[in-house]
């Protein structure tokens, strides 16, 4: 999914807007999602609408063998210093890259910490439908962040990510170091990757 707005980040940004249409474009040196390599390089783009905590949007990325096309909607808000959100995300693919994933997204944040949980189902073309739970703990301060995340139920694997993001000349840039275990690797070995991302968001009046 999105390089900048993922999970709770998208939900919480929705909670701060009144009414806003926006478009975004981006590029990643390696497109990883939840510790799993999707494409060795990937351009992307999306559209979002946010209003009084509610959000809806779509996002697409090149995944080498076709396109990943995501759709999502939900609601986020704040109570004092605590942020919360609930939403739905569907991941759809052209070509033969993968099958459909659909999930409910839950999130909560306080201070520098956020917790994300996704409860989903995978339409496995090669076998029975699979259920999964994704969980993540992220600590972020002044653009620097660390994340520990993994899967349970029919999926398995864990990863750790360290990174930094900033806005430079009106561009959102990021650098991340990813450590993923062998369960998330297509080669069956543990994986370490340095990932560079760049993107820009445009307000649509």
Where are these regions (language model features)?
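Outer-membrane beta-barrel proteins
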Residues: 2-7, 11, 15-205
């Amino acid at each position: 999914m999105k390089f900048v707005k993922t999970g709770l980040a998208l939900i919480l940004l929705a909670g701060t807007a009144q009414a806003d249409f926006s478009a975004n474009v981006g590029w990643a040196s390696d497109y990883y999602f939840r510790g799993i390599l999707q494409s060795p390089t990937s351009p992307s783009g999306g559209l979002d609408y946010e209003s009084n905590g509610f959000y809806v949007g779509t996002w697409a990325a090149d995944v080498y063998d076709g396109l990943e096309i995501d759709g999502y909607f939900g609601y986020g808000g704040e109570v004092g210093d605590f942020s919360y959100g609930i939403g739905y995300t569907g991941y759809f693919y052209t070509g033969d890259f993968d099958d459909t994933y659909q999930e409910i997204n839950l999130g909560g944040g306080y201070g520098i910490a956020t917790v994300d949980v996704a409860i989903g189902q995978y339409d496995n073309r090669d076998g029975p439908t699979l259920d999964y739970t994704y969980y993540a703990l992220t600590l972020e301060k002044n653009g620097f962040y660390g994340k520990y995340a993994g899967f349970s139920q029919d999926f398995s694997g864990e990863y750790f990510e360290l990174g930094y993001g900033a806005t430079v000349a009106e561009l959102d840039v990021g650098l991340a170091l990813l450590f993923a275990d062998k369960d998330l690797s297509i080669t069956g070995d543990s994986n370490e990757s340095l990932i560079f991302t760049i993107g820009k968001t445009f307000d649509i009046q």
